[in-house]
Amino acid sequence: MPFVNIRITKDGVTAEQKKQLIAGVTQLLVDTLGKNPATTVVIIDEVETDNWGIGGESVTERRQQAS
């Protein structure tokens, strides 16, 4: 049973976009590895930008500096 965990920043990703991610990742596993879609699990975790760090800074800080 394949298990895929997708972590993204919480940036207003729509329900439709999440649906497309789940379907697309599932299909990729079917096409590439021959996995059964009925037993493929995809979980999307949305992380607040204050809780996601890159290079010692939160994504929130990095985005503020970039703007």
UniProtKB/Swiss-Prot annotation:
Keywords: Isomerase
Top-level taxonomic group: Bacteria
Keyword Isomerase: yes
CDD domains: 4Oxalocrotonate_Tautomerase
SUPFAM superfamilies in the record: Tautomerase/MIF (SSF55331)
Pfam families given in the database record: Tautomerase (PF01361)
Keyword Isomerase: yes
Enzyme kind, highest EC tier: isomerase
Active site residues of this protein: P2
Gene Ontology MF terms: isomerase activity
UniProt xrefs under InterPro entries: 4-OT, 4-OT-like_dom, Tautomerase/MIF_sf
Signal peptide start and end residues: none
EC id: 5.3.2.-
Family: Belongs to the 4-oxalocrotonate tautomerase family.
Protein's name in the database: Probable tautomerase K2
Organism annotation: Dickeya dadantii (strain 3937)
